[in-house]
Amino acid sequence: MSIGNIVQCIGAVVDIEFPRDAMPKVYDALVLEDSSDASFAEKGLTFEVQQQLGDGVVRTIALGSSDGLRRGMAVKSTGAPISVPVGHGTLGRIMDVLGRPIDEAGPIASDELRAIHQKAPKFDELSPSVDLLETGIKVIDLVCPFAKGGKVGLFGGAGVGKTVNMMELINNIAKQHSGLSVFAGVGERTREGNDFYHEMKDSNVLDKVAMVFGQMNEPPGNRLRVALTGLTMAERFRDEGRDILFFVDNIYRYTLAGTEVSALLGRMPSAVGYQPTLAEEMGKLQERITSTKTGSITSIQAVYVPADDLTDPSPATTFLHLDSTVVLSRDIAALGIYPAVDPLDSTSRQLDPQVVGTEHYEVARRVQQTLQRYKELRDIIAILGMDELSPEDKLAVSRARKIQRFLSQPFHVAEVFTGSPGKYVPLKETIRGFKMLVDGECDHLPEQAFYMVGSIDEAFEKAKKLQ
């Protein structure tokens, strides 16, 4: 246990000098020593070594507020990386990046600690899955189905409904799914974390969820490592042979925290000011979120898209790692269609006739073709009006508008705002409904009948009321 002294402090980045023969290793945790001159600093402040600068000096990131730090303060090396409690004692609890409880419910009842930096599973341990995970959300089950043990990204700009969609997925999957879940709140609003906690508590599934938060108000060091803390807890359950759900809200803030400290660590910024190690940092996290022969991790990640630009380096780097991408569109949200999922932009590796079956595949592709045709005709309609279209095109537009409305659905988590009860639509019902639409069996119904309903039978009932 060597002792060093702070030699420089710039924001969240702190340089600490140790004796040359006792330099801490990269990723080792260091702790601020209690002393009279440390009274203004955060008690027991932890640092993580990022670089060895030579001559006994290491460059670290403070995992907490660096207010009150000054040169000469004593810092002790722990000789090991940051370790957090794992196992069943973490269920039903809210923790911070270091695994300390923040829910005022006493200490975490777990004796087992695990380092947050782990190697990704070896290639021969991996176990890809082709089993589908039913979500009960029509547009997702039809166009971009999820795989058990797969990785899903919810992409969207500010205010198009990423968190609401994620909450609905948690509601539909975590409550129906008897397994365990881990939720990592990375740089998001504290209110959302609070809502999530109460949502879980009210539905009596709190004892199956472990929650880790490093929210918007936390220093960048916390936001940079909190995703790894949550993942370490999920990995422990997976290695026990369980099927785990791992929710991350929001993966973009993980990148952003890295960007905030990157320049202070002396790295040259790359495109759009991101850190030059963007792809490597993302890969380190994503390669660990995987299913092995022992157990599986199904991960659902919200990804903020800066200025609605999907080519921004951060979302573009995240795309590469995912099995399904659910793209939320501002144009669809503007039409009042929620969930605002873009069925033409969203993709899934599972949408393959050998995985989902021929019927599902053909219905999904026909729905996309109809919507694509409508998209192409929209300019003509705007300039010349509907009358100039051929009868086939008029029919395609009419069906596309019905499909567009039928892709909307009332959510359980939004009942308080909409006043209409949430709907869970089984996959078979979803396929049956859209097959009837593209086959022309609903051509006589008004398009309002399809807005905010669950199954196709509800649309028929609504049409009767409208007449």
UniProtKB/Swiss-Prot annotation:
Cited Gene3D superfamilies: 2.40.10.170, Bovine Mitochondrial F1-atpase, Atp Synthase Beta Chain, Chain D, domain 3, P-loop containing nucleotide triphosphate hydrolases
InterPro entries in the record: AAA+_ATPase, ATP-synt_VA_C, ATP_synth_F1_bsu, ATPase_a/bsu_AS, ATPase_alpha/beta_chains, ATPase_F1/V1/A1_a/bsu_N, ATPase_F1/V1/A1_a/bsu_N_sf, ATPase_F1/V1/A1_a/bsu_nucl-bd
UniProt binding sites for ATP: G156, G157, A158, G159, V160, G161, K162, T163
Recorded topology in the membrane: Peripheral membrane protein
Keyword Repeat set for record: no
GO MF annotation list: ATP binding; ATP hydrolysis activity; proton-transporting ATP synthase activity, rotational mechanism
Subcellular compartments: Cell inner membrane
Keywords: ATP synthesis, ATP-binding, Cell inner membrane, Cell membrane, CF(1), Hydrogen ion transport, Ion transport, Membrane, Nucleotide-binding, Translocase, Transport
Assembly notes: F-type ATPases have 2 components, CF(1) - the catalytic core - and CF(0) - the membrane proton channel. CF(1) has five subunits: alpha(3), beta(3), gamma(1), delta(1), epsilon(1). CF(0) has three main subunits: a(1), b(2) and c(9-12). The alpha and beta chains form an alternating ring which encloses part of the gamma chain. CF(1) is attached to CF(0) by a central stalk formed by the gamma and epsilon chains, while a peripheral stalk is formed by the delta and b chains.
Record-stated family: Belongs to the ATPase alpha/beta chains family.
NCBIfam families: atpD (TIGR01039)
Name of the molecule in the record: ATP synthase subunit beta
Organism of derivation: Cupriavidus taiwanensis (strain DSM 17343 / BCRC 17206 / CCUG 44338 / CIP 107171 / LMG 19424 / R1)
